[in-house]
Amino acid sequence: MNIHEYQGKEIMKQYGISVPRSRITFTVEEAVQAAIDLGCEVIAVKAQIHAGGRGKAGGVKITRSLEETKSAAEAILDKILITKQTGPEGKVVNQVLIEEGLKIEKECYLSCAVDSTTSTVVLIGSPEGGMDIEEVAEKTPHKIFKESIDPAIGLQQYQARRLAFNMGINEACLQEAAQCIMNIYRLFMEKDCSMVEINPLITTEEHKVVALDCKVCFDDNSLCRHPEILKYRDLTEEDPREVQASKYDLSYISLSGNIGCMVNGAGLAMATMDMIDHFGGAPANFLDVGGGATAEKVKEAFKILISDKKVAGIFVNIFGGIMKCDVIATGILQAVNALDLDVPLVVRLEGTNVELGKEILKSSWLDVITVNSMAEGAEKIVALVNGKGVVRDERLN
């Protein structure tokens, strides 16, 4: 689960991490009043959306007067902000953070995440803050420093000090920076985060260490242990189809293609999308119904698929292990019948009760095409979508 920058900073304050004074606002009038109340010479007006790259897209503006603050808020609020992470459709900015400006001495980068290679938590630091860490890693990899953490003993003080030193923190701020790193790790572990990032982590002319910008993400599977985190969820920042899918324990991610995919298992889903791409098609989504899907779940999955107006065809690719193919077949027929499906549907079933499942589909009067392999199914749905009218007419005749 993603949260906004200002929410991440609220949590960081609970862990003793210094952040600038700020206030979240929803109107231009509120933004101006917040600037007055902060009483700072320099004010940052920052768009709050669930995406990075806001600064380069014009979503962060530095102002030095109330008139400039007002103009900046007017330019950002209720506008669509397009960054490299939002996609071409962008995101509407519903709120802006009004934040005090600080006198920056140095900018650094700091993050905490799980290293998929070693399956351990790793802290990443760099003296190059305020820019894309991917760009730093590509052009100057020697400026990226890592501290892998032994899960048996946790982060040690000497590791935090070493990372702070490698990040170029001056001696006057070294101890405070090391403590900040320790606090970030504690936040990461106690809140079951998937990532905590501060970019930039700054030192000020007053020798303070401050998180100027941050990103905090949580493991969805851990939210049952953290009801206090759920209050931060902003459904307006999420795809409505993804929200609906989560209600039925379905994993859904919207993509840019026009072929809807319904699969069980993340690995099979990835293979299915690759196969569709191989035959010249483009998947419209990643939809994993999981290992224990019921007929009701399948019906809801179809509702989500056809709610995407880009979908011109659907490929169902199911391997029945715990899940029985006859149950899936029944769910498919119920969904097609109830939803009046008007796009081509190709189904490949394999596994438990597969013959019974195929028989259920073939004996129905509904327009469902069954295939025997993933490759055959992918090729068929791509052909149907690319030559939709001709192919379907030939079949129906």
From Swiss-Prot:
<feature type="binding site">
    <location>
        <position position="46"/>
    </location>
    <ligand>
        <name>ATP</name>
    </ligand>
</feature>
<dbReference type="InterPro" id="IPR013815">
    <property type="entry name" value="ATP_grasp_subdomain_1"/>
</dbReference>
<dbReference type="GO" id="GO:0000287">
    <property type="term" value="F:magnesium ion binding"/>
</dbReference>
<feature type="binding site">
    <location>
        <position position="107"/>
    </location>
    <ligand>
        <name>ATP</name>
    </ligand>
</feature>
<keyword id="KW-0816">Tricarboxylic acid cycle</keyword>
<keyword id="KW-0547">Nucleotide-binding</keyword>
<feature type="binding site">
    <location>
        <position position="199"/>
    </location>
    <ligand>
        <name>Mg(2+)</name>
    </ligand>
</feature>
<keyword id="KW-0436">Ligase</keyword>
<dbReference type="GO" id="GO:0006104">
    <property type="term" value="P:succinyl-CoA metabolic process"/>
</dbReference>
<dbReference type="Pfam" id="PF00549">
    <property type="entry name" value="Ligase_CoA"/>
</dbReference>
<dbReference type="GO" id="GO:0004775">
    <property type="term" value="F:succinate-CoA ligase (ADP-forming) activity"/>
</dbReference>
<feature type="binding site">
    <location>
        <begin position="321"/>
        <end position="323"/>
    </location>
    <ligand>
        <name>substrate</name>
    </ligand>
</feature>
<dbReference type="GO" id="GO:0004776">
    <property type="term" value="F:succinate-CoA ligase (GDP-forming) activity"/>
</dbReference>
<keyword id="KW-0067">ATP-binding</keyword>
<dbReference type="GO" id="GO:0006099">
    <property type="term" value="P:tricarboxylic acid cycle"/>
</dbReference>
<keyword id="KW-0479">Metal-binding</keyword>
<feature type="binding site">
    <location>
        <position position="99"/>
    </location>
    <ligand>
        <name>ATP</name>
    </ligand>
</feature>
<keyword id="KW-0460">Magnesium</keyword>
<comment type="pathway">
    <text>Carbohydrate metabolism; tricarboxylic acid cycle; succinate from succinyl-CoA (ligase route): step 1/1.</text>
</comment>
<dbReference type="InterPro" id="IPR011761">
    <property type="entry name" value="ATP-grasp"/>
</dbReference>
<dbReference type="Pfam" id="PF08442">
    <property type="entry name" value="ATP-grasp_2"/>
</dbReference>
<dbReference type="InterPro" id="IPR005809">
    <property type="entry name" value="Succ_CoA_ligase-like_bsu"/>
</dbReference>
<feature type="binding site">
    <location>
        <position position="102"/>
    </location>
    <ligand>
        <name>ATP</name>
    </ligand>
</feature>
<comment type="subunit">
    <text>Heterotetramer of two alpha and two beta subunits.</text>
</comment>
<comment type="similarity">
    <text>Belongs to the succinate/malate CoA ligase beta subunit family.</text>
</comment>
<comment type="function">
    <text>Succinyl-CoA synthetase functions in the citric acid cycle (TCA), coupling the hydrolysis of succinyl-CoA to the synthesis of either ATP or GTP and thus represents the only step of substrate-level phosphorylation in the TCA. The beta subunit provides nucleotide specificity of the enzyme and binds the substrate succinate, while the binding sites for coenzyme A and phosphate are found in the alpha subunit.</text>
</comment>
<dbReference type="GO" id="GO:0042709">
    <property type="term" value="C:succinate-CoA ligase complex"/>
</dbReference>
<dbReference type="InterPro" id="IPR016102">
    <property type="entry name" value="Succinyl-CoA_synth-like"/>
</dbReference>
<feature type="binding site">
    <location>
        <position position="264"/>
    </location>
    <ligand>
        <name>substrate</name>
    </ligand>
</feature>
<dbReference type="InterPro" id="IPR017866">
    <property type="entry name" value="Succ-CoA_synthase_bsu_CS"/>
</dbReference>
<dbReference type="GO" id="GO:0005829">
    <property type="term" value="C:cytosol"/>
</dbReference>
<feature type="domain" description="ATP-grasp">
    <location>
        <begin position="9"/>
        <end position="244"/>
    </location>
</feature>
<dbReference type="GO" id="GO:0005524">
    <property type="term" value="F:ATP binding"/>
</dbReference>
<dbReference type="InterPro" id="IPR013650">
    <property type="entry name" value="ATP-grasp_succ-CoA_synth-type"/>
</dbReference>
<feature type="binding site">
    <location>
        <position position="213"/>
    </location>
    <ligand>
        <name>Mg(2+)</name>
    </ligand>
</feature>
<feature type="binding site">
    <location>
        <begin position="53"/>
        <end position="55"/>
    </location>
    <ligand>
        <name>ATP</name>
    </ligand>
</feature>
<dbReference type="InterPro" id="IPR005811">
    <property type="entry name" value="SUCC_ACL_C"/>
</dbReference>
<protein>
    <recommendedName>
        <fullName>Succinate--CoA ligase [ADP-forming] subunit beta</fullName>
        <ecNumber>6.2.1.5</ecNumber>
    </recommendedName>
</protein>
